[in-house]
């Protein structure tokens, strides 16, 4: 099993990179960590802390998606419900709630989900977002809480990875044969930074 360290990044799309920067950096407070590309084909990454990034591709012609209530089922092809960003404390949650409201964005009242307290809103691209702070006495990392009333067979096997459900690797790439090819992000190393 690989050792996962968390999410590295989530990549989304925008047709208005300026509004996206103003929202995520200047209103929400995620520092701009990296950028590359040229007009019409740019990528920007905001640091969400602990090595996790929120990335946006700027694609001309992309329009904000229709707002969809968080957690409500839809039918047909669909890829994701909402993006949740962790906050350190209840004070951060209330401060961000007030900032979103003052900036004219719809924002929910805080909700108690048992292990987190959350507010909900939408970014300028129509992306459904949640901001959550932990409930200190509940730690799902060390004490998972599986309370589904009708779990399927896979869930009944418990929270930890279970062996034997996928074929074993029989022909791993040998260290001397491993190659990493340059991608667009190589510009982070090859080009001088503007800041």
Model segments located where?
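Glyoxalase I/VOC metalloenzyme domain signal
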Residues: 1-7, 13-33, 48-106, 122-195
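N-terminal strand-loop-strand beta-hairpin
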Residues: 43-47
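Short acidic/glycine-enriched loop/turn segments that link adjacent beta-strands
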Residues: 38-42, 113-117
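Short beta-strand-to-loop elements that line the ligand-binding cleft
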Residues: 34-37, 108-112
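Catalytic micro-motifs at enzyme active sites that drive phosphoryl/nucleotidyl and oxygen chemistry
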Residues: 106-110, 118-119
